[in-house]
UniProtKB/Swiss-Prot annotation:
Residues forming the catalytic site: C12
InterPro entries: Met_Sox_Rdtase_MsrA_dom, Met_Sox_Rdtase_MsrA_sf
Origin species: Erwinia tasmaniensis (strain DSM 17950 / CFBP 7177 / CIP 109463 / NCPPB 4357 / Et1/99)
Reaction catalysis annotation: L-methionyl-[protein] + [thioredoxin]-disulfide + H2O = L-methionyl-(S)-S-oxide-[protein] + [thioredoxin]-dithiol; [thioredoxin]-disulfide + L-methionine + H2O = L-methionine (S)-S-oxide + [thioredoxin]-dithiol
BP terms from Gene Ontology: protein modification process
One Pfam family here: PMSR
EC number: 1.8.4.11
Protein family per UniProt: Belongs to the MsrA Met sulfoxide reductase family.
Keywords: Oxidoreductase
Function: Has an important function as a repair enzyme for proteins that have been inactivated by oxidation. Catalyzes the reversible oxidation-reduction of methionine sulfoxide in proteins to methionine.
Designated name of the protein: Peptide methionine sulfoxide reductase MsrA
Molecular function, one GO term: L-methionine:thioredoxin-disulfide S-oxidoreductase activity
Length: 178
């Protein structure tokens, strides 16, 4: 089966990348920027909040092993989709919760996933569905961050392990074998 792609944002891309790298059926995860107005943005520019881009991940997946809807359910369970333009202490539109469908089918599934997530939250889901736009890969040092520098980064050590615990507790069937 051909690889399909999903683009989602849910806070710091180091943290979302770490979650999706562990999913059976995911063949690639790339951190990057999408949804803004600046061509070829840098991390520094995106962090400045003036480009309009979100920190996001582009997930390559085998739809015979994990569906787009499954990926969205995992995303909603491993970040707080009720926080507007932030995740924890990361504040700004670059940390927004968003889905960037690459097809009409993904658009419809995104709407259904938001409805499923809303049934599990008392506060309103603020995740946006945004038009697919140009994807800009983040700089090399951001790729596979948790497996490298992230293990020594205090921020990552505080944020990523709880996300992974949620993943393994709720979605054990989708967790890639070690």
């Amino acid at each position: 089966m051909a690889t399909e792609y999903a683009i989602i944002a849910g806070g710091c891309f180091w943290c979302t990348e770490a979650v999706f790298k562990q999913i059976h059926g995911v063949v690639s995860v790339e951190s990057g920027y999408i949804g803004g107005h600046t061509e070829n943005p840098t991390y520094k520019q995106v962090c400045g909040g003036d480009t309009g881009h979100a920190e996001a991940i582009r997930i390559g997946f085998d739809p015979e092993k994990v569906s787009f809807g499954d990926l969205l359910d995992i995303s909603f369970a491993t970040h707080d989709p009720t926080q507007l333009n932030r995740q924890g202490n990361d504040i700004g539109t670059q940390y927004r919760s968003a889905i960037f469908p690459v097809s009409e089918e993904q658009l419809e599934e995104a709407k259904m996933a938001i409805a499923r997530a809303q049934s599990e939250h008392n506060d309103a889901i603020v995740t946006t569905i945004e038009a697919h736009s140009t994807w800009y890969p983040a700089e090399d040092y951001h790729q596979d961050y948790w497996a490298g520098e992230g293990q020594g980064n205090r921020y990552c050590l505080a944020v990523i392990p709880p996300k992974l615990q949620k993943l393994h507790k709720r979605f054990a069937a989708y967790t890639a074998p070690e």
